[in-house]
Amino acid sequence: MYTRILGNGTPLLCIHGFPLDHRSLLPLDRIFGLSGNWKRIYVDLPGMGKSSYLTGINGYSSVLDNIQKIIDEEIGSDEFAIFGYSFGGMLARALTYMNSEKVLGLGMLCPEIIANNSARNVPVRIPVITDKSFLASLDPAQRSVYTKTSIIETRENFEKFNKYILPAFSSLNKQNIDSIASNTELIGIPEPKSYKFYRPTLFITGRQDNLVGYIDSYNILENYPHASYAILDGAGHTAHLDQSTLVDSLIQNWLERINNFKEDYS
């Protein structure tokens, strides 16, 4: 499975959404790099990005197994933090459950909590800002993908979407994508009622996120006693593009809490 490593220090495993690739998380790399000594390990999940060639993928658990191999090979017995976006947030929760003694902190951006689309609590997509003349100028195929989840429909927002989100769709392995979606079972998901992860945790959700919403994240907060939970107005499923300053601030605080935790318990 493809990995891209940036920086040095404590490992920070970064897991993207479905069906994207690691580039969707690169807008956050600046704040990761400014918030301490972090070795950012970005992955491309099976069937996506530069891991599109992988075979033998059957369901969410197969994806999880591939990431666990990366943890074993790249991180070993060291402690590390995890940050997951969308589907990556669900994987991050499962990996935290599996590696709870080694995980220093869990961060999630617009996390998928419930795999079944029809069972999610999500708002209707209502754009907050729309530049109609700009949308009309887009290629119909680009406009169709963009407007499925966008709520800040401007040239500036689309340029970020076009740079960090859209390119992933051209490298998908449809067979693998379909295989992943065929079986959504994951260890530790949903979290057992008795399960608690006591280390610094972060939920960043979008008030206008019509893909995974924000209510389902709130409903599992009791499993994470040291979680900060943020619901951002003017943010959809690409909250880090829609409200970048707020998202950066929240991530910086989360990483500071992890650093303080390491010092207190070292």
Regions found by a protein language model. Give the residues of each.
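Conserved HGGG/HGGXW glycine-rich cap/lid loop of the alpha/beta-hydrolase fold
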Residues: 5-52
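Active-site loop/oxyanion-hole signature of alpha/beta-hydrolase fold enzymes
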Residues: 36-83, 249
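Gly/Ala-rich beta-loop-alpha elbow adjacent to hydrolase catalytic centers
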Residues: 84-88, 92
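Flexible "cap/lid" loop of the alpha/beta hydrolase fold
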Residues: 93, 97, 105-136
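Conserved alpha/beta-hydrolase catalytic His-Asp/Glu region
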Residues: 119, 137-195
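Short beta-strand/loop motif that positions the catalytic acidic residue
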Residues: 197, 203-205, 209
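Conserved alpha/beta-hydrolase "acid-adjacent" motif
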Residues: 210-216
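Catalytic histidine-centered segment of alpha/beta-hydrolase-like enzymes
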Residues: 235-248
